[in-house]
């Protein structure tokens, strides 16, 4: 049996730990060790990895060191296969482009930003051109429905399959309907992180225009790190529109259960990023019966429509009665059948890893 090496090529602690936890706690119990055990991870902080005894994790201090190790392994053994979980490591894309890593060695699960081309500088535009060519050379691509449609417009001949990120979810909560108070101001969650792609200030202005100054706004900005200047910009813009009591900015990463409690309080999510991101938060809001606003440029709306989940589009007319109706629809939805919920996404992972390991064509 072919041994897969899983590559987490950038130091993104929150997402990387989610993947490692899923492999250690779930997949290691039901799949061959050759498909799930071996990881190469870029990480400065390695202490959390001690929680994953079922995995063999090789760590590297930065993206460059990891890329050099992957390239060396790929060149030493051309039968080696790598499963890329998201890929934000430029050196690896260039290695695939130049032939240092062969197409048949790479199986790539799209996370979102690794597919889209948001930055505008000349340096990034040149890199995007090279990366786009490289992305047409992998052995197989896995992604959401919307991302697959986007990808296949450029690379229609590359084999591709549906696969969802293993969002951390408690399936026991899926069957519980949470009653929303119909009186009092609404609570709106803005964005899924402190990343500028959330367009927080634009979202705050739109919320103020649509719902006035009395709604409560919660903005999670616990990551990325070293983001104080942008957080302060968002804070000042928010305080110009909402009172201090109605504006809550979360500047620290918070425990998962505390985050769930915050999401339960919300009446609406507001996510206007122009690409696929934040699926984890969207899943959790849906689980709790909270509708959300998305940009039409976010292709994940196609996955939502496929699962009959109501969604509002940024720029469309929106008022509180429409939100309450969407909450009612979500309450009546069979959430246990949603394809990208836990445990439904597990079967897709079994199929993806078997395919990458050559177990079926």
Curated annotation (Swiss-Prot):
Known catalytic reactions: beta-D-ManNAcA-(1->4)-alpha-D-GlcNAc-di-trans,octa-cis-undecaprenyl diphosphate + dTDP-4-acetamido-4,6-dideoxy-alpha-D-galactose = alpha-D-FucNAc4-(1->4)-beta-D-ManNAcA-(1->4)-D-GlcNAc-undecaprenyl diphosphate + dTDP + H(+)
UniProt keyword Membrane present: yes
GO MF assignments: 4-acetamido-4,6-dideoxy-D-galactose transferase activity; fucosyltransferase activity
Keywords: Cell inner membrane, Cell membrane, Glycosyltransferase, Membrane, Transferase
E.C. code: 2.4.1.325
Pathway: Bacterial outer membrane biogenesis; enterobacterial common antigen biosynthesis
Uppermost EC category: transferase
Pfam families listed in its UniProt record: Glyco_transf_56
Membrane topology: Peripheral membrane protein
Location(s), subcellular: Cell inner membrane
Single GO biological process annotation from the record: enterobacterial common antigen biosynthetic process
Cellular component per GO, a single term: plasma membrane
Major location category of this protein: membrane
Functional note: Catalyzes the synthesis of Und-PP-GlcNAc-ManNAcA-Fuc4NAc (Lipid III), the third lipid-linked intermediate involved in ECA synthesis.
NCBIfam families for this protein: PRK02797.1-2
UniProt family annotation: Belongs to the glycosyltransferase 56 family.
Protein known as: TDP-N-acetylfucosamine:lipid II N-acetylfucosaminyltransferase
Organism encoding this protein: Yersinia pestis (strain Pestoides F)
Lineage of the species this protein comes from: Bacteria, Pseudomonadati, Pseudomonadota, Gammaproteobacteria, Enterobacterales
């Amino acid at each position: 049996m072919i041994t897969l090496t899983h590559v987490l090529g950038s130091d993104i602690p929150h997402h990387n730990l989610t993947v490692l936890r899923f492999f250690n706690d779930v997949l290691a119990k039901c799949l061959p060790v050759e498909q799930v055990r071996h990881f190469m991870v870029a990480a400065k902080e390695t202490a959390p990895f001690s929680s994953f005894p079922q995995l063999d994790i090789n760590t590297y201090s930065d993206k460059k060191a990891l890329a050099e190790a992957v390239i060396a392994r790929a060149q030493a053994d051309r039968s080696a296969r790598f499963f890329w979980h998201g890929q934000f490591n430029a050196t690896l894309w260039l290695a695939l482009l130049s032939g240092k890593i062969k197409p048949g060695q790479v199986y790539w699960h799209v996370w979102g930003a690794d597919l889209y081309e948001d930055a505008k500088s000349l340096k990034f535009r040149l890199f995007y051109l090279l990366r786009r060519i490289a992305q047409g050379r992998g052995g197989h691509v896995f992604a959401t429905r919307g991302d697959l449609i986007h990808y296949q417009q450029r690379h229609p001949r590359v084999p591709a399959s549906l696969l969802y990120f293993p969002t951390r979810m408690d399936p026991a909560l899926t069957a519980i309907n949470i009653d929303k108070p119909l009186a009092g101001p609404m609570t709106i969650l803005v964005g899924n992180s402190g990343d500028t792609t959330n367009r927080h200030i634009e979202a705050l202005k739109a919320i103020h225009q649509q719902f006035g100054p009395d709604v409560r706004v919660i903005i999670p900005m616990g990551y990325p790190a070293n983001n104080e200047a942008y957080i302060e910009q968002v804070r000042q813009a928010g305080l110009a529109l909402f009172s201090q009591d109605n504006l809550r900015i979360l500047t620290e990463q918070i425990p998962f259960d505390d985050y769930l409690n915050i999401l339960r309080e919300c009446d609406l999510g507001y996510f206007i990023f122009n690409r696929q991101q934040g699926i984890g938060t969207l899943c959790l809001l849906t689980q709790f019966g909270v509708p959300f606003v998305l940009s039409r440029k976010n292709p994940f709306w196609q996955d939502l429509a496929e699962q009959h989940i109501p969604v509002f589009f940024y720029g469309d007319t929106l008022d509180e009665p429409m939100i309450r109706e969407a909450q009612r629809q979500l309450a009546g939805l069979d959430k246990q059948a949603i394809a990208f919920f836990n445990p439904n996404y597990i079967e897709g992972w079994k199929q993806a890893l078997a395919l990458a390991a050559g177990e079926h064509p």
